[in-house]
Amino acid sequence: PAVLESARLLLDSLRHEAMGEEATQAEMATKYAEYFPRFVKHGVKIGLLNEALLQFDMGKLGAALVPSRDLQFGYLGLQTLYDRYFLVDQYVGGRRFELPQCFFMRVAMGLALNEVEREARAIEFYNVLSTFDFMSSTPTLFNSGTQRSQLSSCYLTTVSDDLDGIYEAIKENALLSKFAGGLGNDWTPVRALGAYIKGT
């Protein structure tokens, strides 16, 4: 169908943009494993990825990538990843340098950073994510493995009934929403409209 053909053409374009060269689906069997360590090192170099990712065995993780899983995407899914989730190199005119399987492994590595057997756990996470058996929330997909490890979707806070508490809650909301966290505030402790406030 035309939709699948559009997705394949977009995939070709993404590969060319990220790797700087064209590659067929068959060639990606080796190219993904070769490109993956370069992707991680470049992300660390430009300050987007957490330096701790360099401690992983890149050869092992690169070998675990399954290029055929790129073909699971329809056009809209692939375009959404490109537009909203892939890492962007602002130093090179906004070039996306992340590919679908690199994206899933980057997220998996971020989730496995504190695991004892981190390569094994990263591969397990990668396999459930890249097969769509499980999908993490948007903040996790945005931030896992990056310098900002804010992975939660929602934060619930209680605002205290004083000037410091109200403005502290506003500040916390701004910082949390900066990295895609959803917010819920309990304003119950704050006195009602028209209530007496001691002043000068």
Regions found by a protein language model. Name each.
Residues 1-200:
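Extended catalytic cores of very large enzyme megasubunits
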